[in-house]
Amino acid sequence: MAKTNSYKKVIAGTMTAAMVAGVVSPVAAAGKSFPDVPAGHWAEDSINYLVDKGAIVGKPDGTYGPTESIDRASAAVIFTKILNLPVDENAQPSFKDAKNLWSSKYIAAVEKAGVVKGDGKDNFYPEGKIDRASFASMLVGAYNLKEKVDGTLVTKFDDLRGHWGEEKANILVNLGISVGTGGKWEPNKSVSRAEAAQFIALTDKKYAKPENSDAKVTNVAATEPTQLTLTGTGLNKLTAEDVTLEGNKAIALEASKDGKSAVVTLSGKIAPNKELPVKVKGNTFIVKYVYEVKKLRVEQLTFDDDRADQAVVFKLNDEKGNADIEYLDIAGHDVKFVANNLDGTPANIFEGGTAESTTGKLAVGIAEGKYKVEVQVTKRGGITVSNTGIIEVKNLDAEATAIKDVVFAVDTDKAGVNYAKPLSGTDFTLNSKTLVAGEKAGIHKVVAQINKENKVVDPSAISLKSSNPGVISVKNGEIKAEAAGSATLTVKVGDVTKTFDFVVKTDTRKLTTVKANPDQLKVVDGKELPVTFVTTDQYGDPFGANSGAIKEVFPQTGVVKVLDVTTTNEGSIGTSSIKVKGENVGAGTIHFQNPNASGEGYGSLHVEVTKSNIGHEAPRLELVSKAGQKGEAADTTLGAGNTVAYQLSNYTTEGVYADAADLAGYEFRVGNDKIASAKIEGKTLKVTGKTAGVTDVILTKDGATAGHATITVTQENIQITSVKFKDVEVEQFENRKVNIDRVLDVVKSDKDDVLNGIKLNISTEHKVRIVDEGTEQGKVYLDRNDNATFDGNDVALGYVTAVKSNDTVSKEGNDLFKFLTDETATNKNDVFKGVTTAFGDKGTVIFKVMKDRVAPTTEYGTKAVTINVIKEEI
């Protein structure tokens, strides 16, 4: 059967290291030579290399079959051998075309391990062949070759331009693994066994993961709360993946040059005074971490005189982070803070008006000045370690240095806009800076930087004025759109200002877009899943759609029969979470249209309904907002005063979300109830942030843990303040890559790349990273837990996007011709691929760093790259 490009991508995604290992037949094991691979054969050295490595299989008749193609079933067998996956002799894969075959147990093994996927229609195509583009993609993934690329990728072969495998093939060319065939690359040509051997051998010689069979670990010790130290030999051949431990994860391993010791960094802290099994290469070591305080240093900081939730900070030993009093308590240590005035008399600066404290939390309303604070850490029944530092107290409230964020809202009921609390009635926040003539608006919130912290400004400290009262007038903080035109609004707090360019239109707001998140829903028949619907007008602002404003056109498959999208809830106009029920097994798309005769489309939602088949796994603790997104972290960050909801989710044996478990009989525990509180309501566990900090929430039943989440409560609004772009010149030559690397300093990583040149409104040692692939490609975030992956503890900062200018011209078939002039939530340009210049290109590619990728008014900075490769008529 002929393969489509989509099918080719499936092949590429199913095997990440095919033919790197395997079982050598008796004939192959006897020697390197095969009768059909004569001396001097162009692939002889590569075939011999893989024979030596035990990575290829000779045929029963003793031949190699260099001209034969590789099928997917054979690759599944090899992949199983590579990863030493457990093989169940009676196992059958879920793919309907891969059952009861000689290779079924191997296909089942790689499917269970998450290595392979089908075509989305329960097919695996075990006899399907692999083309060169798919094989290139396979090699790039198996050896992480994208990270090895030096410089900009260039498309040297015309038959690669616009092909789905262009980038992967270019990586092989860049690294010298492939040189093409007779001036072409032939991406659609099937790969022969000889070609496969050549590809793999060249790649393996350069980039194979070091063999760690010689590594021998003799001891594992916990040397810090988040650090293990290994001793032995050959440890420089280990990676973090070789170290596993329950309830924690090894995220980095750094070995000494002689390989006799290695330091392993963990993602979380080790529980003190408890035995912990640590596995290294299958061997188990019992580690018991006894926490000892050897050094202590009080941080000399400046505090505000009347701010709540401030505390003295100190560091222990040589640890990077601040000391954790809760962890010290678990480790058997008591902490005591003693404050004195500089003359030695007691200073009652702690909570409760005392001079001594066990938490270090400061009182509200402290006299300005300097104080000596001694911190004493005493091991119960043991010694005390102490240190004294000087802290200073000032009035920092009025010292705003910058306005970081201003939120405007439309006052639809002419009753004023609520400040720093939920909006009332049908008022809505503005995404754009557009008003319609006659509308009234107001400031919903202003956040200013005060002593390097972001605080919501008291409304009495804000002043507002308009540059053009004939277009937009301002009176007592009330904004009114008087007439069509433009005006600049200036917001002032203290001595700092921030300006906003507004336009006033005369076109009445109307519904233009309905976006569903997720826009592809997978649900069990008879069950419901929440979908967030966002409705916006022609200006990109929230639009409250009432019942009847949207015509839901249901698919004939009957997967969904009832849905009424309305977004008029008070406080969240334009956004609503609505449960969608799966009715019949099958798939189909719900289209959202104008109910009037024009019937223009607003958006769509694709729904796949699967049969009910509840599995026997323990339910998973998930955020209600992410119910059904199996694998999403339960950890989250929320602002003080905000609430998040959790549930225990049941899944089918196929991994499809079924429903929420009943929480009757469950209990919860909050690690620090001063940071957050929790309560169970029906099937929901609700957690509310109280004060800034980090704590754990644990759900239990009959004493056993049923779920766990780490909650980070913050009172800050971290955001980008400026972007440093590279200097760029006009691109006048063909085959030049214009992508994110052209304009921004991107440092490659095995996970999410580091993005340099992004300045934030806070001082931090954490890296700013960017997601380089997947649905969230281009997302910029602060990697707070330093694991190079965006999860619940990290802070989303915005996106890097790229579009071409409207006046750009290009020849059909060129990258620039296909590049979008405008992005939508579902149709985006690939900023990492960018465009490769070609004859006929003339125009501009504009790279933007934005808070909201589909809201042009939220940009933090832009850089334009001019392209002029006109050498022939278009």
Curated annotation (Swiss-Prot):
Main location: secreted
Annotated keywords: Cell wall, Repeat, S-layer, Secreted, Signal
Gene3D superfamilies: 2.60.40.1080
Gene Ontology cellular component annotations, sorted alphabetically: extracellular region; S-layer
SLH domain location: 31-93, 94-151, 152-214
InterPro entries: Cell_Envelope_Struct_Comp (IPR051465), SLH_dom (IPR001119)
Location relative to the cell: Secreted, Cell wall, S-layer
Signal peptide: 1-30
Pfam family, one: SLH
Domain of life per record: Bacteria
Listed name of the protein: S-layer protein
Organism: Bacillus licheniformis
